[in-house]
Amino acid sequence: MKNNQFMVIKNNNHSKKVKISIKTAEELAHMDFPDREWLIKDLWREREHMMIYSPTGMGKSWFAWSIATAITGGGVIKEGLWENEKLEKVLLIDGEMDMEDLKERQELSIKATDADQESVYKNLQIISRQDQMMNLGFLNLGNKESQKSLINYVENEGIRVVILDNFSTLVDMPDENSASCMQPFQDFLLNMKQRE
């Protein structure tokens, strides 16, 4: 067994000695894991990340709203393919849309997914940049303080799914294509995933 070996880890130009869990191939082969629940059947399971990508205007936000209403209201995205039976709490964070547009998308998504409206109203929470007071700033998920605040909120509210719409408006970084610039956000995503 090689668990709990000390290694020097370099992170953001700082080195520190930390305990690292190391498994042999045999130990991994004998590990048992509980079944992960489907958030949306045959599409998305708990402890998984999903990123939706397409050119502008192809319906990414509509799809995100469909996922949110299906999970919170027991809806169906595609009959017989992507369905949800167990209701979960969802937090949708929107970085750019007008509140009136968000309201319209919510109502149309509830109808399109045949979700239970009262369940969606109870289980879906929305944080919108456009709903905030001017000049007070907004979440920057590239920033550790914003990340910590969001994680605390999610844990305190019992939220199972966080939907970020969209990356460019919620993560302030100099270069989205730079691996080093992405590292704080990647750390945040892994931190969220490990909290399950």
Predicted regions and their residues:
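Substrate-engagement module of ASCE P-loop NTPases
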Residues: 150-155, 182-196
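A conditional alpha-helix N-cap/helix-loop micro-motif detector
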Residues: 33, 143-144, 181-182
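Conserved inter-motif catalytic segment of the P-loop NTP-binding fold
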Residues: 17, 56, 84-175
